[in-house]
Amino acid sequence: MQDIEFLYLTRADVIATGVDMQMVMDAVEDSFRLHHAGQTNLPWKTVLDLGERERGRGNAMPAYVGGEYDVFGIKWIAGFPKNPVLHGLPRATGFFVLNDSWKGIPLAIMDCTWLSAMRTGAVTGVGAKYLARMDSESVAMIGAGVQARTQLEALKVALPGLQQVRVYDIRRETAETYATEMAEKLSMEVRAVDNAELAVRDADVVVTVTVADEPIVKDAWMKPGSFFSAVGSYQEEEF
């Protein structure tokens, strides 16, 4: 019987492929179109709780995408919010398994930490491309972790006119680090502020990327006509 060979890609391998945010956004937009056309199968994800909500959980997320892609697979990803502080590890870690849709054989097993963050950012980017005002100039970013980086990267692709970012995080030093890093990476004005309201007031685009279980953003702070993307386990705006 023929041996089955497949690619194994580490996080470094995945990054080294040269995939950038525009490419990820294009793939996400294609997937949305295929989903609308009924050419996907996207079961509910399975959440594996570990008995203590604050500890973390595992998520199994299978899917099939047809069209020119015609592949199926699963993302197995663990979310442990305290990892960065307690262990110096990413909050989310896991891998993808990608399968041939005609033979069922695995095509690749690859780290999903980086690409999953890119994909989540790309969803906001695609949404902003069609729903945000194209003359948007300012962003409020609530949260300054890994996901906040890819969110802003995708927004800059979708809305090239963005110039200013106000970021708030419960840890001021985290927000300051984010501001320095992203200002240099995207050639934008990025500054940390002392609270969520200062970030949100008058912002053209608002993104929440936290795991808070209480509302953070209030409707009264929102600028009319602004674009709002709530990323995470909870709805973080209070109407």
Q: Model segments located where?
A:
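Short glycine-/small-residue-rich Rossmann-like dinucleotide-binding loops
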Residues: 210-212, 232-233
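Glycine-rich Rossmann-fold phosphate-binding loop(s) that bind the pyrophosphate
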Residues: 144-145
